[in-house]
Every structure is written in structure tokens, then in C-alpha cells.
Amino acid sequence: MQMIVIFIIGLILMYADMAFTSFSPMTMFSVEVYFVPKLLFMYILLLTIYAGPRISMLFAILFGVMLDVYIGSLYGIHIFGFIAFVIFMQTAFRVFYRDFVAMAFVVLLNTFLFDLYQYAVYSVLDFIAMPFFDYIALRAIPSVLVSALFFVILYVLAIQTAKVRKELRRIN
């Protein structure tokens, strides 16, 4: 049951991520600003803490493959990034424990680093032609700010998913 709930939430978040790309770029003060939150990525990171690393690794692989196939520009960038950051999240929370502020900071920092990872790979392969500081100012920082707004919603979803898991264990 928990796996089905996680999968459905993941699909909805993947769709929401894609829907946000249709709104970007937005022109603000005659400058194009990109708001691309990584809702699915943040949810997978939160699953690492609340549902366990095995479950989050499974969904990191599953949704990584789905995104790589759907986007199709470079295969492997999402699956590798998701797996690497799930491992990093698991390692980070051996140090930070489950403090909400520390967790929010680590998840948003990982979101920023994942965005930089994608930028680095795409720029090395010459798929993107945006200068680094423009990328930081016009895409990475606005995306993290929007992600921060949605973090609380994802946090509640992750906790509810963990409660489904605990309820199933208690029943069995």
C-alpha cells in the first residue's frame, strides 16, 4: 500500500515539475527568470529520512529512469543524480538527525547542488549556453526559493507516507 501511495505522489509531483516548466521563463524587470522547483527530487530526499533509504533508493531509480526517458536529452543524468543525492542525504542525516530546520537546510542545499550538477553536465556537453553567474542569479536561486515555498507541503506528504508505513507495520 505504501509503495502505491509513494508512486502516485511521485507521479503527481513529476507532473507538477513539468507543469512549472511551462510557466518559465517569466519576465521580471525586463529579465527572464526561470522558476523550476524540484518537487519530486525533494520528496525523494525526504523519503530517505521518513520511509527509509531502501525505499527512497528504489523510487530514485524508478523516477530517475522515467525522467531520463521522458526528457530524453541525456540519459542517466537524473538517475545518477537522484541516487548520489539520496546517498548523500542518508549520510548527512547521520550527523544532523531529524531537526526540522537542519533537514530543510540540507534538502534545499541538495536541491541547489542538484541544479548545479545538471548545469555542469549540460554545459560541459554544450547543451546549455548560459553563463555561470547568470545561471545562479536567474535560475538556481529563484528555483530554490520556489522550492522552499513548497517544502512544507512535501514535508507533510513525506510524514503522511511514513505514517502509512507505520500503520501497516502495526496492523501486520
Predicted regions and their residues:
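Terminal, non-globular segments
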Residues: 1-172
